[in-house]
Amino acid sequence: MFKICKYVIYDILRSKVLIAYMLFLLAISFSLFALGDDTAKTIVSLMSVVLIIVPLISIVFSTTYFYNSYEFLELLVAQPISRRSLLLGEYAGVALSLVVVFLVGIGIPVCLYAPNSTGAMLVLSGTALTLTFVSLAFFASVATRDKARGIGLSLLLWFYFAILYDAIVLIILFSFNDYPLDKAVIALASLNPIDLSRILLLMKMDIAALMGFTGAVYKHFFGTMYGLFYSCGLLLLWIVLPVIICARMFARKDL
């Protein structure tokens, strides 16, 4: 497993696509910090990159890499190594590579310009989202053998969590605004890793008051230490659960 992980990391870090992704993050981060006088506003701008661009690149790159290395996986399956270890090694290599690139592209500028708790939360949220969407990418890739369908499913998952889910939540809130929705709002936020990361950042920036009723509910629950542990626990679950499911699927899959 560790040898596979090491090989994957070495292979990915030479990828021109990943180098371009890292340079893009560095350029965006340094540009925003250089042009903005207020670091808090710059963090808000970077939050959009972390919540939208980072999950998109993570899930698309991971899916593409998995299918491109499928013949390599088929070769290793014939060796005396368990399929579960093979898949976990592949996942660890891809995930660690993308995390390293994110930490260089976003983490270094944040450490230089915003070395505070808000900056740390931005980096931690981005790292969690990177791992989450790599997990979802592997789930989509193992679920279907066809590369086009796998990439399509990955893009559909990203579109659902990044854009469509918020629209569905708004429709639910407007449709049932005459009913007490405190617990429902928390439950709906728990079902989306991007929303969880956004809430953690908003709580750190203390701008929940600008969000009205929803912000008050978030502040009351997620603003507490219990809410923080709850959010981190759910994000960890979003990372681990898809990997466990796809590892079991891969172990039984007919290659």
Which role fits each region the language model picked out?
Residues 130-177:
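A structural motif at transmembrane helix-loop-helix junctions in multipass membrane proteins
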Residues 164-248:
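Terminal transmembrane helical anchor/hairpin motif
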Residues 44, 54-59, 88-89, 117-122, ...:
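Short alpha-helical transmembrane interface motifs in multi-pass membrane proteins
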Residues 1-20, 239:
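Aromatic- and glycine-rich beta-strand/loop motifs that create alpha-glucan
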Residues 32-44:
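Short, hydrophobic transmembrane alpha-helix segments
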Residues 64-95:
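Helix-loop-helix units of permease transmembrane domains in multi-pass membrane transporters
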Residues 83-119:
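Selective transmembrane-helix segments that form parts of the transport pathway or gating/packing helices
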Residues 45-69, 98:
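Long, hydrophobic alpha-helical segments
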